[in-house]
């Protein structure tokens, strides 16, 4: 970790503006950090050395001319789910072997238009399906954090594990990520970073490989709350190519940071106290409540009665949409093609060889719940539950609550290749217990580091906001960050 790679986005932006450093120096520092660490951490599946250097050179020229954009010269990593023109985009799946898009996703196009530099594509769970970044065709990502005195590798969380690990290990200044049921917030909590899932419709989905279209939303993972605010401002936009994109002004999120919490009402939902929740998570939650109280917020006990149905409903809705979205991968136009006796056999062979175990599992669940005779019993009921979950939140917000504080995850990061979890998918799915409600209701949610456990691992809290009121989340998350401090892993890689 060099002095340059230790800079936050806000610090690097100021130094670039003052011409104390150049974009080329900053980019080279990150590229050399990646080259020395990536073999161990496995955060990147493709490093774009030449492109990064030419983008940095162009940034330096714009800075010299006084034409710097909001992210001029800031080196970022891009989750492998975002289409990047002419650059490896495979959703970390074998079935998309060799795919290089002819177009740029709206999110990445917005970032490059603001002057950001692309370092490369980040590892992730295959098609964003996973909570540990162990389902990637390119192998598992290692969490830069380790327990005190231990050499055991831990997962970085998922599906945006590469994004979170790269940010925590200082292998990029910030990263793009996506969240369908917790894939930004859970890895952020596991790696001591900040991750925000914006309101559904705030950020365009165009050019992002689809998992579950009614739940997917892109957002940033960053080192601190201010950096997350800076990135979201650039990522968000109205996009007529995405029918769910919302035509609302994009606030200056950074301006919300440091504002007083006086008069802010924070709800504490009793239903989030789940059986078997470790003491350290309960203690962290109490600590977070105190931090917000000390910052001037009013704490209110609330009820979200349908919370317990969120996880089973999510694991019906998301696989159903995935089975439909992933039907397009058949080996005909692009990606992997395995020859067969006839066209139907070719489809079958290609999909059998191209998809990993977890993706196949979810496609099968999705196809089953959508099939005749089961559609009403499963899919329709899950959608009704989803409406009830949304109504729970609406009722609470209607009573004047501005944001809701909950744990982000039911534990700290767990071990890599945990056989117990590998053999029991339901146990693995329980990692999403605190995060899926936010996607089901289309709300914004942020994960912010709030403490370190006895083993020296980071723990995160989650704040859930009203639709399109991300500023409130940045404001409250910053208060927690100020009280808890920032956490960086000790370098072992």
From Swiss-Prot:
Reaction(s) this enzyme catalyzes, per UniProt: L-glutamyl-tRNA(Gln) + L-glutamine + ATP + H2O = L-glutaminyl-tRNA(Gln) + L-glutamate + ADP + phosphate + H(+)
Biological process annotations from GO: translation
Enzyme Commission numbers on file: 6.3.5.7
GO molecular function: ATP binding; glutaminyl-tRNA synthase (glutamine-hydrolyzing) activity
Keyword ATP-binding attached: yes
Coiled coil: none
Keywords for this protein: ATP-binding, Ligase, Nucleotide-binding, Protein biosynthesis
Class of enzymatic activity (EC top level): ligase
PROSITE patterns reported for this sequence: AMIDASES
UniProt superkingdom: Bacteria
Entry annotation: catalytic residues: 79, 159, 183
Pfam families noted in UniProt: Amidase
GO cellular component term, pick one: glutamyl-tRNA(Gln) amidotransferase complex
Quaternary structure note: Heterotrimer of A, B and C subunits.
Annotated function: Allows the formation of correctly charged Gln-tRNA(Gln) through the transamidation of misacylated Glu-tRNA(Gln) in organisms which lack glutaminyl-tRNA synthetase. The reaction takes place in the presence of glutamine and ATP through an activated gamma-phospho-Glu-tRNA(Gln).
Family: Belongs to the amidase family. GatA subfamily.
Descriptive protein name: Glutamyl-tRNA(Gln) amidotransferase subunit A
Species for this entry: Brucella anthropi (strain ATCC 49188 / DSM 6882 / CCUG 24695 / JCM 21032 / LMG 3331 / NBRC 15819 / NCTC 12168 / Alc 37)
Organism ancestry: Bacteria, Pseudomonadati, Pseudomonadota, Alphaproteobacteria, Hyphomicrobiales
């Amino acid at each position: 970790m060099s002095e340059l790679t230790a800079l936050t986005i806000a610090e690097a932006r100021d130094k670039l503006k003052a011409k104390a450093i150049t974009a080329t120096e900053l980019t080279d520092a990150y590229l050399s950090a990646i080259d020395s660490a990536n073999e161990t951490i496995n955060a990147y599946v493709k490093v774009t050395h030449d492109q990064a250097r030419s983008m940095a050179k162009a940034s330096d020229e714009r800075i010299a001319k006084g034409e710097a954009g909001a992210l001029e010269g800031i080196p970022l990593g891009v989750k492998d789910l975002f289409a990047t023109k002419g650059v490896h985009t495979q959703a970390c799946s074998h079935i998309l072997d060799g795919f290089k898009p002819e177009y740029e996703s709206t999110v990445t196009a917005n970032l490059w238009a603001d002057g950001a530099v692309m370092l490369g594509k980040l590892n992730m769970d295959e098609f964003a399906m996973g909570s540990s970044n162990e389902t990637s065709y390119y192998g598992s990502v290692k969490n830069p954090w380790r327990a005190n005195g231990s050499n055991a590798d831990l997962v970085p969380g998922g599906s945006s594990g590469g994004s979170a690990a790269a940010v925590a290990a200082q292998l990029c200044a910030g990263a793009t990520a996506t969240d369908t049921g917790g894939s930004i917030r859970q890895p952020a909590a596991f790696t001591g970073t900040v991750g925000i899932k914006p309101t559904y419709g705030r950020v365009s989905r165009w050019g992002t490989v689809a998992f579950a279209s009614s739940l997917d939303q892109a957002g940033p993972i960053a080192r601190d709350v201010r950096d997350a605010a800076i990135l979201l401002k650039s990522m968000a936009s109205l996009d007529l190519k995405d029918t769910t994109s919302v035509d609302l002004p994009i606030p200056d999120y950074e301006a919300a940071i440091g504002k007083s919490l006086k008069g802010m009402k924070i709800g504490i939902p009793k239903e989030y106290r789940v059986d078997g929740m470790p003491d350290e998570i309960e203690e962290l939650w109490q600590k977070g409540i105190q931090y917000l109280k000390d910052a001037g917020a009013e704490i209110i006990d609330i009820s979200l009665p349908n919370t317990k149905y969120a996880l089973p409903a999510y694991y019906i809705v998301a696989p159903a949409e995935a089975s439909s979205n992933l039907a397009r991968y058949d080996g005909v136009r692009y990606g992997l093609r395995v020859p067969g006796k006839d066209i139907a056999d070719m489809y079958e062979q290609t999909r059998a060889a191209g998809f990993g175990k977890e993706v196949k599992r979810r496609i099968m669940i999705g196809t089953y719940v959508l099939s005749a005779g089961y559609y009403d019993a499963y899919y329709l009921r899950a959608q009704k539950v989803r409406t009830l979950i949304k109504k729970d939140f609406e009722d609470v917000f209607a009573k004047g609550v501005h944001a809701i504080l909950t744990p982000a995850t039911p534990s700290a990061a767990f071990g890599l290749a945990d056989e117990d979890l590998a053999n029991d998918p339901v146990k693995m799915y329980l990692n999403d217990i605190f995060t899926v409600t936010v996607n089901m209701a289309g709300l914004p949610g942020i994960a912010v580091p709030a403490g370190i456990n006895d083993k020296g691992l980071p723990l995160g809290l989650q704040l859930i906001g009203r639709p399109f009121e991300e500023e409130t989340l940045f404001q409250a998350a910053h208060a927690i960050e100020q009280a808890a401090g920032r956490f960086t892993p000790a370098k072992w890689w």
